[in-house]
Amino acid sequence: MSSLSKEAELVHEALLARGLETPLRKQELDAETRKTRIQEHMTQVMQLLNLDLSDDSLADTPRRIAKMYVDEIFSGLDYENFPKITLIENKMKVDEMVTVRDITLTSTCEHHFVTIDGKATVAYIPKDSVIGLSKINRIVQFFAQRPQVQERLTQQILLALQTLLGTNNVAVSIDAVHYCVKARGIRDATSATTTTSLGGLFKSSQNTRQEFLRAVRHNG
């Protein structure tokens, strides 16, 4: 991983140490080769479904899916895509909660490869540094762009921010609809899943925790 940014390496190592990294094999193929291989296999899948790939509506679908997987919805599997992080010295000595609400995220259930659609609320109490606000959104999106389970996604975002900011005082909550529940199986179209991960004062201080949870309840 020598080509990765320092921040990407730190986050990846922290997740590995805590057993929170997405199960990954060593990457041996470049992006274009992976797209070619996925296209070939998706062609076979569609043929096994008795779809006629000579139809002009379907002919390019395997290529589109391969490109979507590698460049878009699973781009977070490659730490070369980890967002560039801007940290700013906390010269103003900010010591109150900073909260970013209504962060939209779209991920993919790793059990059925269907959509997870939701919103995240992220808060932290600055220590020596503050982070550019859009970087929080980008970190959420990076980890969402993987096959995921919501519990792990929530904890990955938390640990990434704790690692980058040098503080345990971080909290993350995600509320999401799982299409593996909505579109198949039980086919419950109205249920949603909420996961929360708390660190530092958000866990140990009832007042801090309640302040964060009030922000979560105001979501949407």
From Swiss-Prot:
Keywords: GTP-binding, Hydrolase, Metal-binding, Nucleotide-binding, One-carbon metabolism, Zinc. SUPFAM superfamilies: Tetrahydrobiopterin biosynthesis enzymes-like (SSF55620). It comes from the Bacteria. It comes from Yersinia enterocolitica serotype O:8 / biotype 1B (strain NCTC 13174 / 8081). Belongs to the GTP cyclohydrolase I family. PROSITE patterns: GTP_CYCLOHYDROL_1_1, GTP_CYCLOHYDROL_1_2. GO terms for biological process: one-carbon metabolic process; tetrahydrobiopterin biosynthetic process; tetrahydrofolate biosynthetic process. GO terms for molecular function: GTP binding; GTP cyclohydrolase I activity; zinc ion binding. This is GTP cyclohydrolase 1. GO terms for cellular component: cytoplasm. NCBIfam families: folE (TIGR00063), PRK09347.1-1 (NF006824), PRK09347.1-2 (NF006825), PRK09347.1-3 (NF006826). The lineage of its organism: Bacteria, Pseudomonadati, Pseudomonadota, Gammaproteobacteria, Enterobacterales. It holds the Pfam family GTP_cyclohydroI.
